[in-house]
Amino acid sequence: TVVSIPNGPSALAVKGILAMDESNATCGKGSYADELVTFEVACXGLDVAASRYSEELVKAPSALTSVVTPG
């Protein structure tokens, strides 16, 4: 799966979480500024995660404010 991500802080955050998922095989979670939409990086793999992020970026490409990883 290839995800086209626009440049900017949001892109860095998304690329970071996707890279984390690929290298550490962990789950991740992010939330939008309005905190009404929460999404997760599936443990199942990077393809699933990329697909999900693609959907969310279409909804609000500049609204991603933070990415957290479970301890």
From Swiss-Prot:
GO terms for biological process: glycolytic process. It is an enzyme of class 4 (lyase). It is found in: Plastid, Chloroplast. One of its GO terms (cellular component) is chloroplast. Its EC number is 4.1.2.13. It catalyses: beta-D-fructose 1,6-bisphosphate = D-glyceraldehyde 3-phosphate + dihydroxyacetone phosphate. Keywords: Chloroplast, Glycolysis, Lyase, Plastid, Schiff base. The keyword Plastid applies. The keyword Plastid applies. GO terms for molecular function: fructose-bisphosphate aldolase activity. On the 2D-gel the determined pI of this protein is: 5.6, its MW is: 25.2 kDa. Belongs to the class I fructose-bisphosphate aldolase family. This is Putative fructose-bisphosphate aldolase, chloroplastic. It comes from Pinus strobus.
